UniProtKB/Swiss-Prot annotation:
Family stated for the protein in its record: Belongs to the RNase Y family.
Protein's cellular compartments: Cell membrane
Single GO BP term: mRNA catabolic process
Membrane topology, from the record: Single-pass membrane protein
Transmembrane segments: 4-24
Domain HD: 356-449
Enzyme class, broadest EC rank: hydrolase
Sequence ranges assigned to domain KH in this UniProt record: 230-293
EC number: 3.1.-.-
Protein name stated in the entry: Ribonuclease Y
Pfam families: HD (PF01966), KH_1 (PF00013), RNase_Y_N (PF12072)
Amino acid sequence: MINTILVPVAVAIVSVLVGGCAGYSLRKNKWETQAQNAAHDAKHILADAESKAKAVEADLASQQEAMKKAAADAKKEKILEAQEEIHHYRERVDNELNERRQEVSRQENRLLQREDAIDHKDSLLDQKDSQLTQKENQIKKLQAQVLEKEKRADQLVTEREQKLYEVAELSQEDAKKIVLDKLSDQLVKERAEMIEESNQLAKAKADHFARKVIVDAIQSSAADTVSEKTVSVVNLPNDDMKGRIIGREGRNIRSFEALTGVDVIIDDTPDVVVLSGFDPIRREIAKRALERLIKDGRIHPARIEEMVDRARKEVNDDIYEAGESALMELGIHKMHPELVKILGRLKYRTSYGQNVLSHSIEVGKLTGVMAAELGLDEKIAVRAGLLHDIGKSIDHEIEGSHVEIGVELARKYHEPDLVVNAIAAHHDDVPKLSFIAELVVAADTISSARPGARSESLENYIRRLEQLETIAKGHIGVKQAYAIQAGREIRVMVEPDKISDARTTILAHDIKNQIEQDMEYPGNIKVTVIREKRAVAIAK
């Protein structure tokens, strides 16, 4: 029984041992397999880690290289930016240096120009001093010659008186009379020579200054010559327009004439209407209004009044603009607006065919140039020259001469006293209180006498020529007189038996004085006296 029990137990123990060994063997194999797999996996992981490490190292190396490259590029870019900034800075510095050099150069040029101007003025002053010295020397020389001649004349008179008294046993008074009669011709000759010499000296001195003034001023302003007229012509598209201008029972033309103050002349002349009136501003307003009415086509009293008002406003604006333009051209900045408007009216005023506004501008420039040459107030001189004929703008509206009206306007609008005196004295009506007034007279004469500056009507022209010849013929010894060169020269033919060569100069001087006293004329008149004596002998 015990064997029966031990056998199963032994079998069980053996089974357990066999199972344990088999299990251990199986587990050992499994463990070995797992260990091999683990070792394989470890190797694989290690290889993968190594490859990843290498990849990381390569990536790090590439990143490091890229960073180095980026750093180098950034460094280069910074260097380039710095170089560019340095270049720009250098350019700015160079530009500033160039600008400063140019400014220094300009200042040097201005200084050189001022030095040249000062040197020029110094040379002019030296020339004037030398001229004055020469003139003083000449005057002293002439005075010495005159004194010497007077002494010689007294000596000759004494000698001849004594000789005649001794020879002819005449009284002293009779001898003196004979001597004085004989010396008369000689004294006349000496007087003529002195007049001629003085004229030549004055002319030689004045020519240079006159040329300079005329070149400086007249070349910068040339006033056109226009024909003085009292009519304006308006062209019509056709003759049918004349009836529309006249209107029913003449109401249109009557309304137009009443509003404008001009006469409308409609005659047989084809396609034209004539506007007649002495006031050029009214004629201009009427012309503009009529031209607009013709263009518009609607012509009736209400439309006429509208167009006339519009034309009057336009002309008034043009007048003010003309006055402002004259002030700007001469550099005058302050003037009463009403005086500017009155000045602009001179645009429509003429004198001997010369536009008065252009003439006034020219006189202003000439006066300014001469004042600057003499060291006077140039601004006041220009102002006085511009306003010297201001009275002519309204002399047909207000009683009085243009000089009186100009003086009243200048005082009313508070012009300087020197300007008022220059206006009042430019026709020698009152004494001149300053050199500027003298310069205005000279500039007015130069502008008026400039060739082509003025003209006159045919009737006045013929009357002036006749008066010129009559004055010349009224002197003793004159045989014939001819006015030539449009009345700018009078040639006088004298009888050689009655007028000596010495007396021709005195005769020319006397005729010149009478012309200045008795006549009014534009510009200058040259007096030429011609004495001719012929001796004829016939050989047979």
